[in-house]
Amino acid sequence: MQRVNVGHKALADYNSLIGRALAEEIRALAEPLKGRRMLHLSATAFGGGVAEIQYTLIPLMIDAGIDAEWRVIQGQEEFYDVTKTIHNALQGDERGLTDGQRAIFDGYNKLNADSLADADEWDVIVVHDPQPAAIPEFVQTTRPRWVWRCHIDLSTPNPDVLDFLAPRLRAYDACIFHMPTYVPHGAGLNEAVIWPPAIDPLAPKNMALAPDDAAYIVDQFGVDVSRPLMLQVSRFDPWKDPLGVIDAYREVKRVHPGMQLALVGSMAHDDPEGWEYWNRTQDYCNEDPDIFMFSNLNNVGAVEVNAFQVQAAVCIQKSIREGFGLTVSEALWKSRPTIGGRVGGIVAQISDGETGYLVNSPEECAKRTLDILADPGATRDMTRRAKEHVRRKFLMPRLLRDWLALMHRMAGETTVELEVVAGD
């Protein structure tokens, strides 16, 4: 395994954004935990929301007095091919696992478990998502409490793949899910804890950026900043439905011929299908000069994503399945009018008609885009409400508070406030 260097962050820098009550609660929770040790394990250090969260969460935990560390597991392409199949199946894909794929999954998990020689030196070990989920089965130690943090939608999983994973999940003292509907019934979990993820308002991706600066950055990529822009920021993945976004854009363009579309994504090494779907999306664009596709490999990093979101007339997350979709909160925090698919965690972030719009089809997405463009006054009111909603519920200090509360619970202190669902 490889340790990830996360740098330094200070909780005090967030106080003006979160208010006194939450800041004081965090301090009170952190004080008796000083010196406790928490290790996080995940599949990748870049590309995707899990890694983004870790780059802020881990240094904030350290600032709060926790001895926290983040490591990335090792794996080859055959392993990530299998874990992508598992990921898709847990979100409803009908394809199951062969005996060979099951052996590959367990084999790489054992390989990583064997490299975890210091497991008994940690108070809590957190495993993120399915890729490393079997590691506790292969670690011979009784000291750490094991926690599985699930970042995907498990509301309608492939039953065969869930049956394969469930015995491995029963090795955990607690499993954390974004929403109650994601807790898999019949899996026999010891305990399920519910909390949503969060964004870092001070990270380069979300820091305040003047409109002129955003326009300058976007202009460098060949986008005409004098014309309106529809934007989706997401991985290139069928669950994110970039083809549906293109369909919506084409409908809008019939009314607003100057409309442009940018699809911006990050290509992660644990997502072998990403390039295949990139190519499929590119073909679907049909060489339209007003459709742009960018990734981290086009030098689109955190600041550039920020600029595209600030510049966009409408931000879209038209997922058809979605673990949570933090790009929604990112756009809402920037006071951008936002449209999301009526699925998963997007519904927790958008109150339809109040803080944004929820849609079920490309046609609805196009209609709501036209509504936004037609009524700037109502749109401004909606975006103000949306920013305040994100401030209350989806900023990183609230997530830190939840992790500190869980550490108390793992130490046997059950009086801390957490949403807990009994395992079944």
Short names for language-model regions:
Residues 378-393, 399, 405:
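A short, well-ordered alpha-helix in the C-terminal region of glycosyltransferases
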